[in-house]
């Protein structure tokens, strides 16, 4: 799964059978030189692996990848491959086991280094050791060297009572810790977006508002189809299927961007939703991010 989302083109149902996927290896052969499969074959291969893992029904947390964690990754997988119904089914099941944080819990938990919290399904940093600490400290140091994107600051400015505004200071320097974790809030966003793709607007709004209600501390107003904000101007202009953003889809993607800020999600969101080209400036030079 991780190789597919990094090294293959984003999944499109209409072209997956023609798009190149990964070389598939399911047995050891030192002389083998497998050619690349199609993206559809790659997805089928990954799903078979997930299903095999689930057959063990592991509940022992010492093995890390228990059945609920496998199902959480399956929700991500179905979401990436645009199997919206299955994405909803698996995400809902795991969301029931890992409840999201309320606003007061979020403040205390989001920057936790080692302490597990009820919403974290799996995380990469679980104990102190020299190598992990070096990587952890390097990540926190490096992120201080570049201000938070003004477009993201403007997005947060639309909801001044959002508890996540504390993720950066007035100089646009991040105060949120760079982390690698899989939180149940992502599952809520998967459900909301999947429902939107299926044309089930009331259900999409329900899950979008479920997360928003836990992040906006004062003067919270639930979104309806009548009061959704205009499409937010950003690099992403189309959804995962290539359709121009609607107000609902824009609201969901913006919520995801705010919630998963500095958690390794943005690159994949750009890839999944149209692969927009854009540029940034550094030291007087222009650097273009081409279609990827």
PLM ranges: what are they?
Residues 1-59, 122:
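Aromatic-anchored glycine-rich loop motif in surface-exposed flexible loops
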Residues 82, 86-185, 217-239, 246-251, ...:
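Hydrophobic-face positions in mid-chain alpha helices that act as interaction patches
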């Amino acid at each position: 799964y991780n190789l597919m989302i990094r090294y293959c083109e984003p999944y499109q149902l209409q072209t997956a059978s023609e798009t190149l996927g990964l070389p598939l290896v399911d047995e050891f052969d030192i002389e083998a030189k497998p050619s690349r499969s199609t993206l559809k074959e790659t997805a089928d291969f990954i799903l078979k692996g997930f299903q095999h893992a689930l057959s063990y029904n592991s509940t022992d947390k010492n093995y890390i990848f228990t059945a609920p964690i496998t199902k959480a990754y399956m929700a991500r997988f179905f979401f990436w491959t645009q199997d919206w119904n299955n994405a909803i089914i698996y995400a809902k099941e795991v969301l029931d086991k890992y409840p999201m944080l309320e606003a007061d819990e979020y403040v205390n938990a989001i920057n936790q280094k080692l302490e597990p919290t009820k919403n974290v399904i799996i995380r990469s940093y679980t104990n102190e050791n020299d190598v992990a600490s070096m990587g952890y400290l390097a990540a926190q140091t490096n992120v201080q060297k570049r201000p938070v994107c003004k477009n993201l600051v403007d997005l947060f400015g639309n909801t001044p009572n959002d508890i996540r505004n504390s993720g950066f200071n007035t100089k646009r320097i991040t105060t949120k810790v760079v982390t690698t974790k899989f939180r149940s809030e992502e599952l809520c966003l998967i459900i909301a977006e999947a429902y939107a793709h299926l044309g089930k607007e009331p259900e999409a709004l329900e899950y979008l508002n479920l997360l928003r209600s836990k992040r906006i501390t004062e003067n919270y107003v639930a979104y309806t189809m009548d009061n959704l904000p205009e499409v937010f101007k950003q690099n992403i202009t189309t959804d995962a299927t290539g359709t121009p953003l609607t107000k609902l889809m824009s609201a969901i993607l913006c919520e995801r961007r705010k919630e998963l800020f500095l958690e390794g999600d943005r690159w994949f969101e750009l890839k999944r939703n149209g692969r927009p080209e854009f540029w940034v400036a550094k030291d007087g030079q222009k650097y273009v991010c081409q279609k990827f």
